[in-house]
């Protein structure tokens, strides 16, 4: 646990994996660069997690790879280590490109790559919307070995010829299920069209719906697969409950009642729309509860500041849309409340994955109106899980 990965589930994970994949029990067995190994150990890793021990060697061999594993299993480091192994830092050109669905995730990936590559003199830039284009241009013109970004800004920088693609050898799609939803699909194709024909493609995600797997055939050649069977994906250590609220109007009072009974370390409350986030934030503040909020239409600086406050524990309760749900590491979060059930059932695992990350116990509570019962049952079926009615002693579950 010292290295931030929950390994207790590793032995029980079912890997629906290509036959040619072997397991590398140590990082030394992967034959990584000495400078990279130093960075890995300095970062706090001692031995590879289940997904790392299977996927890194395949990616470093140049194979197109689909890697699927739950939150908290070290997915980000899987491709970060692989990228750092294959790039040549002597060549000051972009050699690997990582696309993520949110700005926060792209920035976090950049910081992981910089930390793991601390002894390699690696240049990695976060190329994201909502930031100063001039800064992007300056950094890209200087030369970046790795670019971690969101599809829109990356496509724009390629079109403007500031992000040069001729040396790119690897494209990573992180949280591919979200990226390949309709909103990002065209932008990914825009980026892909500019890449050299032999570019290696790596797809990483906690959930890979069948239509996404089908779509990857369009830009992957004979990919190696490291897949956890879908029914294994509900996160261990997360207790999942629902509260029947009958009507939408009753949710607010239910939330206030919960605040009175729960002593919370940190909690995230998810709503489905920006408008609902703003409305609930105002209503909670009127009732003298201290909350912060975040959604995708806030200026980037404001989002960064809110994230930093929450990471440092200065704010304890964050109300957010799904912009926050994917891959953001805040280890103190012990409670997630789905004020609204997610409209996309695949987002459910990303939301509740916020609580109990890295083996910490967590509780997820779903507010369910009469109209939501069908959606809740659909989520239970999809993940082969059971979501029980919340018991009276819920405060004990968090202690």
Curated annotation (Swiss-Prot):
A motif (Q motif) lies at residues 25-53. Belongs to the DEAD box helicase family. DDX48/FAL1 subfamily. Keywords: ATP-binding, Helicase, Hydrolase, Nucleotide-binding, Nucleus, Ribosome biogenesis, RNA-binding, rRNA processing. ATP-dependent RNA helicase involved in 40S ribosomal subunit biogenesis. Required for the processing and cleavage of 35S pre-rRNA at sites A0, A1, and A2, leading to mature 18S rRNA. The keyword Hydrolase applies. It is an enzyme of class 3 (hydrolase). Residues 56-226 form the Helicase ATP-binding domain. ATP binds at residues 69-76. The keyword Transmembrane helix does not apply. It catalyses: ATP + H2O = ADP + phosphate + H(+). Its EC number is 3.6.4.13. One of its GO terms (molecular function) is RNA helicase activity. A motif (DEAD box) lies at residues 174-177. One of its GO terms (biological process) is rRNA processing. Gene3D superfamilies: P-loop containing nucleotide triphosphate hydrolases (3.40.50.300). This is ATP-dependent RNA helicase fal1. GO terms for cellular component: nucleolar chromatin. It comes from Aspergillus terreus (strain NIH 2624 / FGSC A1156).
